[in-house]
Amino acid sequence: MKKLNNRELFNIDQELFNFRGIDRAIWTRKAELMAKNGDDLVGGGKSGISKPTENTVMKFATDVTLKNLELFKETVESFKKQLTGEQLDIFYLRWGQANLDWEEIAEKQFVSNATIYRKRAGILETYARMKGVL
């Protein structure tokens, strides 16, 4: 099985930082889509009843950015279910609100730096497998 090199580990590490603000990003994107723009007035010859709810649902269903944000959230949520208790603690210390660096996490977990970096590699490789990178 292929192992991730340091650059790939770093990139996945940075990608997981986006999870902290994913709910806000999804909410913001939905608000942008719901905002009125002039697109609804195109073809103005029809005097039918407008369907704002249907239009909004269609915008949500067809927006690629929103779909990608929701897929990322779903992927990370299912990834978290695969982690052990200790790995989940490390996940929240690193990519949760705590935002600690690896040396600080090693101190909190009472392990050496080498051990925490091995655990980091294991966590990131699990995520890479879920994404299909490995």
What do these predicted ranges mean?
Residues M1-K80, V133:
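N-terminal interaction/assembly modules
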Residues A98-A114:
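Helix-turn-helix DNA-binding module
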Residues I116-M130:
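DNA major-groove recognition helices of helix-turn-helix
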Residues I26-W27, E70, F91, T115-Y117:
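Short alpha-helical segments used as structural interaction elements across diverse proteins
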Residues Q82-L100:
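Short amphipathic alpha helix immediately N-terminal
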